[in-house]
């Protein structure tokens, strides 16, 4: 039997959060953490968590698993369990709605600030705006983000200033459009990032890199933005 400790909090009935212990029979199999949560829900139907695709694509089930953020659906027990103990908590730094469900509003608000869509005020071509293979290659490692928030909620700078520091996920997407040859709003995008908090509160500790389920490198992208800001003189 696997010993599982999960964070519980129902604001309608709990005065404060608490950790609840469960014994889960995994059948001796190396199942995913999400499967363990489903077995817990069979024991307690009121247990709440987010999940959707079960394939590491939607980003819904980001949570803190034995002290490290990750996606429950693609995290096998063998990768995290030590001493037959599993501890699951909500993503840190965000308000808890119930149990493992967090309020993502500030995360999406910061993402929205970078205007994550192509902007080009030149006349649109009849078919599409073309890119060379080399130009397209510059977007690799940027567009694959699934907005699971594992990176931003592992970042102390985001914990301390969630309303000012944009966070790794938003800044990765900021650079994704700065690097896109089809976008011609570089000057405006950089001007919007020109303040002491939006970009420069990153301390390059690379927590974001260590937890990204897609193997992306927000710290590197933030470094590129810093360089562009310095070179532009803004």
Please name every model-derived segment.
Residues 53-62:
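Short, structured protein-protein interaction patches enriched in aromatics and acidic/basic residues
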Residues 44-50:
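Active-site phosphate-binding and catalytic loops of NTP-dependent enzymes
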Residues 25, 64-68:
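Short strand-turn-strand beta-turns centered on an Asx-Gly dipeptide
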């Amino acid at each position: 039997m696997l010993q599982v400790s999960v964070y519980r909090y129902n604001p309608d009935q709990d005065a404060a959060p608490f950790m609840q212990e469960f014994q889960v029979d995994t059948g001796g199999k190396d199942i995913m953490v999400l499967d363990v949560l489903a077995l817990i829900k069979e024991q307690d139907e009121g247990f709440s968590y987010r999940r959707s695709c079960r394939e590491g694509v939607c980003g819904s089930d980001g949570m803190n698993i034995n002290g490290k953020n990750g996606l429950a659906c693609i995290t096998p027990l063998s990768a995290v369990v030590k001493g037959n103990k599993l501890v699951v908590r909500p993503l840190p730094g965000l308000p808890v709605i119930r149990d493992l469900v967090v309020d993502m509003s500030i995360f999406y608000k910061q993402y929205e600030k970078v205007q994550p869509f192509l902007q080009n005020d030149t006349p649109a071509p009849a078919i599409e705006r073309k890119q060379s293979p080399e130009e397209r290659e510059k977007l690799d490692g940027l567009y694959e983000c699934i907005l699971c928030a594992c990176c931003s909620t592992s970042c102390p700078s985001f914990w301390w200033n969630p309303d000012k520091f944009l966070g790794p996920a938003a800044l990765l997407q900021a650079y994704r459009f700065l690097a896109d040859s089809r976008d011609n709003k570089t000057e405006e995008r950089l001007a919007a990032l020109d303040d002491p908090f939006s970009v420069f509160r990153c301390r390059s500790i690379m927590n974001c890199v260590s937890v990204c389920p897609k193997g992306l490198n927000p710290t590197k992208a933030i470094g590129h933005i810093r360089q562009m800001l310095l070179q532009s003189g803004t």
